[in-house]
Amino acid sequence: MTATFDKVADIIAETSEIDRATITPESHTIDDLGIDSLDFLDIVFAIDKEFGIKIPLEKWTQEVNEGKVSTEEYFVLKNLCAKIDELKAAKA
């Protein structure tokens, strides 16, 4: 597991009161963990703050709604963490 995943999983557990032990890299934030849109906004805000980045959530949501990508592309944790790592690298 990556340091990014560990931090993101901790943020999810703290923000949504989901048991940290149930959060895996394969977890889908909505389908598996049942995180609603308001909690997800809180999680994204906390991730932005923790990593010093800005997740383009509006763009991602639009791409999913337009059928350009599947929800798994952005909302399965291992993929989300990879996107966070890309955003961190682009900022560095």
Curated annotation (Swiss-Prot):
Q: Describe the PTM.
A: 4'-phosphopantetheine is transferred from CoA to a specific serine of apo-ACP by AcpS. This modification is essential for activity because fatty acids are bound in thioester linkage to the sulfhydryl of the prosthetic group.
One Pfam family, please name it. PP-binding
All copies of the Carrier domain together span 2-88
Q: Which Gene3D superfamilies match?
A: ACP-like (1.10.1200.10)
Family annotation (SUPFAM superfamilies)? ACP-like
Which keywords does this chain's UniProt record carry?
Answer: Cytoplasm, Fatty acid biosynthesis, Fatty acid metabolism, Lipid A biosynthesis, Lipid biosynthesis, Lipid metabolism, Phosphopantetheine, Phosphoprotein
The biological pathway it contributes to is: Glycolipid biosynthesis; KDO(2)-lipid A biosynthesis
Lipid biosynthesis is among the record's keywords: yes
Q: What does this protein do?
A: Carrier of the growing fatty acid chain in fatty acid biosynthesis. Is involved in the transfer of long hydroxylated fatty acids to lipid A. Is acylated predominantly with 27-hydroxyoctacosanoic acid.
Q: What is this protein called?
A: Acyl carrier protein AcpXL
Gene name per UniProt: acpXL
